């Protein structure tokens, strides 16, 4: 099944992952947005390739070991590096809604949403959380110095937003990265 994935492509992806890991470790708070965006784009390319590679390897492994659990498989080296890269790309950002736990953050978003819209908490709870988050973030967009775009809540846009602001952890937005 691996006929379309050459070993050269895998080793190139591995060396690109190592190179990207070195680059993201060197990123500082004064890094240019363009440099950060390049890292995010390269991370996304490597993540797509790794997903394809893992899918192919998983199928091959299941064909060779049909009676064993797939949990016994060893994770790929690229996948391990991508986890480390992602950890370096995740940054903390402080907003008026930032709290230490996810449930406190959710409550802070709801309180801020109620304050902005004038709705009661019970009514706010009936709203979709995506709408609550977007209203609150839009309301604070000037303060946070980012432009709200229509695809802002896609994974890549959230990651770019987090990197450029240097203020919000993924748990604030309710995403598990």
From Swiss-Prot:
It comes from the Viruses. Keywords: Host cytoplasm, Host-virus interaction, Inhibition of host innate immune response by virus, RNA-binding, Suppressor of RNA silencing, Viral immunoevasion. GO terms for cellular component: host cell cytoplasm. It holds the Pfam family RSS_P20. It is found in: Host cytoplasm. GO terms for molecular function: identical protein binding; RNA binding. The keyword RNA-binding applies. Gene3D superfamilies: RNA silencing suppressor P21, C-terminal domain, RNA silencing suppressor P21, N-terminal domain. Acts as a suppressor of RNA-mediated gene silencing, also known as post-transcriptional gene silencing (PTGS), a mechanism of plant viral defense that limits the accumulation of viral RNAs. Binds to ssRNAs and dsRNAs in vitro. Also functions as a replication enhancer. Homooctamer. The eight monomers assemble into a closed ring that binds RNA. This is RNA silencing suppressor. It comes from Beet yellows virus (isolate Ukraine) (BYV). The lineage of its organism: Viruses, Riboviria, Orthornavirae, Kitrinoviricota, Alsuviricetes.
